[in-house]
């Protein structure tokens, strides 16, 4: 039976073709974003990564350097300055009307 199943063990030479192209230099680029569905502040309508309207108007002030994002326990995100002004009048989330509680804020 072994005689019937002999395998030809000749080495096959594979012809090496030159590569179609060669990468000589590669500049990697990365992109990231906040893990939230809505990327605009619902109060000022600016992109959450941009300055809020208050900081855009006062670019000379130190507050513009501290324009951060604030998340509530409901997972809605707003500019810290925007939600702070909102909370002076009503202590609820502007989007779902639940009582506002800070989950985290900062970059």
Swiss-Prot record:
UniProt-listed CDD domains: mRING-H2-C3H2C2D_RBX1
Zinc finger residue extent: RING-type: 52-97
Major localization listed first in the record, in broad terms: cytoplasm
CC terms in the record's Gene Ontology section: CLRC complex; cullin-RING ubiquitin ligase complex; cytoplasm; cytosol; nuclear SCF ubiquitin ligase complex; nucleus
Residue sites binding Zn(2+) 1 per the record: 41, 44, 79, 82
InterPro entries: RING-box_E3_Ubiquitin_Ligase, Znf_RING, Znf_RING/FYVE/PHD, Znf_RING_H2
GO molecular function, one term: cullin family protein binding
Single GO biological process annotation from the record: heterochromatin formation
Keywords for the protein's UniProt record, in alphabetical order: Chromatin regulator, Cytoplasm, Metal-binding, Nucleus, Transcription, Transcription regulation, Ubl conjugation pathway, Zinc, Zinc-finger
Record pathway: Protein modification; protein ubiquitination
Binding locations of Zn(2+) 2: 74, 76, 93, 96
Domain comment quoted from the record: The RING-type zinc finger domain is essential for ubiquitin ligase activity. It coordinates an additional third zinc ion.
Self-association state and partner proteins as the record states: Part of a SCF E3 ubiquitin ligase complex containing psh1, pip1, pcul1 and the F-box proteins pop1 and pop2. Instead of the pop1/pop2 heterodimer also homooligomers of pop1 or pop2 may be present in the complex. Component of the rik1-associated E3 ubiquitin ligase complex composed of at least clr4, cul4, pip1, raf1 and raf2. Interacts with cul3.
Protein name: RING-box protein pip1
């Amino acid at each position: 039976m072994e005689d019937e199943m002999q395998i030809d063990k000749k080495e096959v030479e594979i012809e090496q073709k030159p590569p179609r192209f060669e990468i000589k230099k590669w500049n990697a680029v990365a992109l990231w974003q906040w893990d939230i569905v809505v990327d605009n502040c619902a109060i000022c309508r600016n992109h959450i990564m941009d300055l809020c309207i208050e900081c855009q108007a006062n670019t000379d002030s130190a507050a513009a350097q501290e324009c951060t994002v604030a998340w509530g326990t409901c997972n809605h995100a707003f500019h810290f300055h925007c939600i702070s002004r909102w909370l002076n009048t009503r202590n609820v989330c502007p989007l779902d009307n639940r009582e506002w509680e800070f989950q985290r804020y900062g970059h």
